[in-house]
A protein has these predicted regions:
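C-terminal functional module detector
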Residues: 1-8, 12, 32, 169-170, ...
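A metal-dependent hydrolase metal-coordination microenvironment
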Residues: 2-118, 124-135, 140-161, 165, ...
Length: 334
């Protein structure tokens, strides 16, 4: 991810990279799926029917050709599910379905396309399963269908294990939609920063990691330098900065309110100041050699600034709103 992603020029476009139609095991036709996402304000879509590329044209959405391929065996016996994006060679995909996972990844990369490992938790993928293959750009950190069906939609632990091992991969939120009607759809998406609305620009930005993922809340701004991290968001319940091992920082509204109520009794805290600015409440907290500034508005956290915090190998931001919906930045690597 570009460190200046949120301050650089460009526009944000919203899209889903995992959806199924009647051409595999979805309930809607390709045209109905396009209409569904268009009516909900999406800009682009990848239809990823199982083992095949669904070819369809539309003036409503930017369409990225793709497919979901089941291939190989993981250590626990199930297949990997690989999203191949910007691939339209059905014949070749059928061939590589019977090859190794690595052979499929290598083929897609030669086609100037990219791959994503779908729903690692749902697929029973271990850390070794993900560590021992190369060439995929990311994993589904959130899969809406796996979440609502069997409570196995989140894969943050898989992601952090890979990042800790030095494997540079992105986290993507998707739907994996089959049923629609807002049941397993419009649940996970990526917001991509582009210079213009085109398939080429969207694909290029995704490959560079110039996007963030969400199931609800908005990351309005994120910046990092050696001594300072700042994030601004829509009102949320919790803000996390995740790094290697026991490093990182987390603040929730519950923690925030307890600090306010007992600021003179919490021994690890230094100076604590609470001020008000129009509708905003601002808390300034000293914690050892570190400084924390938290701004709230209408019962939600809207910004956090950390100064003097030490991260190792990487850090990523994760926010959670009052409904439990999340958003994830891509990692900044050190």
């Amino acid at each position: 991810m570009d460190k200046n992603l949120f301050s650089s020029s460009g526009i944000w476009v919203r899209g889903n990279l995992h959806a199924h139609t009647k051409n595999s095991d979805g309930l809607l036709s390709p045209e109905e799926v396009i209409d569904y996402y268009f009516s909900r304000g999406y800009d682009f879509l990848a239809i990823t029917d199982h083992e095949k590329v669904t070819t369809v044209k539309s003036e409503k959405l930017i369409l990225l050709p793709g497919s979901e391929i089941s291939v190989g065996k993981c250590l626990l016996g199930d297949s990997y599910h690989i999203l191949a994006i910007n691939v339209d060679n059905n014949e070749a995909l059928q061939k590589y379905k019977n090859e190794s996972v690595q052979a499929l990844l290598d083929f897609v990369n030669k086609e100037k396309s990219f791959t994503i490992v779908a729903h690692p938790y749902w697929s029973k993928l271990t850390h070794s399963d993900l560590l021992n293959i190369e060439g995929y750009i990311g994993i589904e950190v959130y899969n809406g269908g796996c979440d609502i069906e069997v409570a196995k939609g989140f894969s943050m632990v898989h992601w952090d294990n890979l990042l800790t091992q030095g494997k540079s991969v992105y986290g993507l939120a998707t739907d994996d939609a089959h049923y629609y009607g807002d049941l397993d759809s419009a649940r996970g998406w990526i917001n991509v920063k582009v210079k213009e609305r085109s398939a080429e620009e969207i694909l290029s930005s995704i490959k560079k990691g110039n996007f963030y993922s969400s199931s609800g809340p908005i990351i309005e701004y994120l910046s990092y330098n050696e001594n300072k991290v700042e994030i601004r968001t829509s009102p949320v319940e919790r803000v996390d900065f995740v790094s290697e091992g026991g490093r990182g920082f987390s603040v929730s509204l519950d923690t925030y309110n307890k600090v306010k109520q007992a600021k003179d009794k919490i021994r690890i805290l230094g100076k604590v100041e609470i001020t008000h600015e129009r509708e905003n409440e601002i808390a300034y907290v000293e914690l050892g050699n570190s400084k924390i500034t938290i701004k709230t508005e209408r019962g939600g956290i809207i910004s956090v600034v950390l100064e003097g915090f030490s991260f190792k190998k990487y850090f990523r931001a994760e926010i959670t709103d009052h409904n439990g919906k999340k958003a994830w930045s891509n990692p900044i690597l050190f």
